A protein has these predicted regions:
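Active-site donor-nucleotide binding/catalytic segment of nucleotide-sugar enzymes
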Residues: 9-12, 115, 172-192, 220-258, ...
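Active-site and donor-binding regions of nucleotide-sugar-utilizing enzymes
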Residues: 11-33, 40-84, 94-101, 106-165
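A donor-sugar binding/catalytic signature common to diverse glycosyltransferases
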Residues: 12, 31, 291-339
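Short internal beta-strands
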Residues: 38-46, 260-266
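Intrinsic disorder/low-complexity segments
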Residues: 81-109, 192-222, 253, 274-282
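A nucleotide-sugar donor-handling region in carbohydrate enzymes
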Residues: 143-211, 222-237
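C-terminal amphipathic helix plus adjacent low-complexity
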Residues: 193, 349-420
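Active-site donor-binding acidic/aromatic loop of nucleotide-activated sugar
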Residues: 281-291
Length: 420
């Protein structure tokens, strides 16, 4: 019989922070909903996890992680196991009755969440498919976030394994009510649609206190149009020019208008700054350190405009109701444009057609890595954002995403309904 209170989450880190970011967020959301859950996170890159949650010790193969009033077990994917035993003495769990067997580690081989088609570590694969292992296990594959139609079709679709007692099913994040929706954490619940930016005064104040206290970012309170920039390594010329032209255009009617761009730590920071210097530093930039996940969530809600990349920050941006631009992960044959256009199709009905034209034009140009990005649509989109013309479209889209429900809650409801 399934022990539905014990959940193992598997994460093989491919994108430095994207994969573990979603997994950490999912674990937080599950614990927030049900603090009594026993979670075990199996992660292949503890260094990346440490950047996101400083409590993680990258040198420990097995460790406890304290989140609010709960304790998770964190396990290194790369454990070396022979015949069901850890190879080195230092990797044993320190328990009174430890006999070196993996089964004594209390690994919850009941509900297993495989995230992003990550597969399973060798030691877990051997245990699951050992001839003597007959207990029923439900594997739930949490797939990549996409707006493509196949997400609707694959959600809750059963899949086979090589053993009848090992069940598997697809669980699809997405942007429609036919999918599992998005992970909604506390910060999104604080302020969805409560103000033009979708952020309550409480959330805004909490962010200012939390981020400035831990990171020294005291410039947040300055009156300026605040842009957050987080991207993959790219040329950045069109982005810098588009922002500079936007500021110049706004100053035609307001000489005091200014832009501050907050540069996230990462590979995009240096090329952005290089192009910014070539244009004689036309606006202010502030380099921000790598933020803990909770700080990041609050921080972006204080912005006026967002550049985000990958999966996790896309979901955060979409839920805020703020104007944003998404950069998809580059794929062979420019396939990322398929994903970008799929999301564009989901969004466009929430906007007046004329207002959506520059949004669509820049999203497509920005994600077309085979052609030069055009700056003009970005300038127009920023002008519409500063004048609150496109705000309703982004807010209405965010409302719909909230109405679709919380992926973590849908997941727990699905697990509750299992009768294996």
């Amino acid at each position: 019989m399934l022990d539905k209170n014990k959940i193992m989450i598997l994460c093989k880190v491919v994108d430095n922070f994207g994969d573990i970011g979603v997994v950490y967020r999912l674990a937080r959301a599950l614990s927030d909903l049900r603090p009594n859950l026993e979670l075990t996170l199996v992660v292949s890159n503890l260094e990346s996890f440490h950047k996101m949650a400083s409590q993680i010790d990258p040198t420990k193969r097995i460790q406890d992680f304290h989140y609010k009033n709960t304790t998770w077990k964190i396990v290194d994917w790369n454990l070396e196991v022979e015949n069901g035993k850890l190879k080195t003495e230092s990797e044993k769990l320190e328990t009174e009755n430890d006999t070196d067997k993996l089964s004594t580690f209390h690994f919850p081989l009941s509900i297993i969440l495989e995230c992003f088609q990550c597969g399973r570590p060798d030691w877990l694969e051997e245990q699951l498919f050992a001839p003597e292992f007959t207990r029923t296990v439900q594997i739930i594959q949490i797939d990549y976030l996409t707006a493509e139609e196949y997400a609707d079709e694959f959600h809750l679709l059963k899949s086979g394994t090589r053993r009848a007692n090992i069940k598997k099913i697809f669980f699809m994040p997405g942007f429609t009510e036919k999918t599992a929706g998005l992970i909604i954490n506390q910060v999104e619940n604080l302020g969805a649609t409560a103000s033009p930016s979708g952020v309550t005064p409480f959330a805004h104040a909490h962010c200012l206190h939390s981020v400035s206290a831990t990171s020294g970012l005291h410039t947040l309170a300055q009156p300026a149009f605040k842009i957050f920039f987080f991207a993959y390594e790219d040329d950045c010329s069109a982005v810098v020019k588009g922002i500079a032209d936007f500021q110049n255009k706004m100053r035609e009617t307001d000489s005091d208008f200014s832009v501050v761009v907050y540069l996230a730590e990462g590979k995009s920071s240096a090329p952005f700054e290089e192009k910014w210097k070539i244009l004689n530093s036309p606006f202010k930039i502030v380099k921000i350190p790598f933020l803990q996940q909770e700080e990041f969530d609050y921080f972006i809600t204080t912005m006026d405009f967002l550049f985000v990349r990958g999966e996790d920050s896309l979901a955060r941006a979409a839920l805020t109701g703020l104007p944003y631009i998404w950069q998809a992960y580059k794929q062979d044959e420019n396939y990322q444009l398929v994903k970008v256009n799929a999301l564009i199709d989901r969004m466009k009905d929430y906007f007046e057609p004329k207002l959506f034209e520059p949004i669509q034009a820049f999203w497509q140009s920005y994600n077309d890595y085979e052609n030069t990005t055009k700056s003009e649509p970005l300038t127009l989109m920023l002008l519409d954002s500063a004048n609150h013309k496109n705000q309703k479209g982004f807010s209405d889209f965010a409302k719909k995403l909230h109405e679709n429900g919380n992926l973590a809650e849908h997941l727990l409801n699905y697990i509750d309904g299992l009768s294996l």
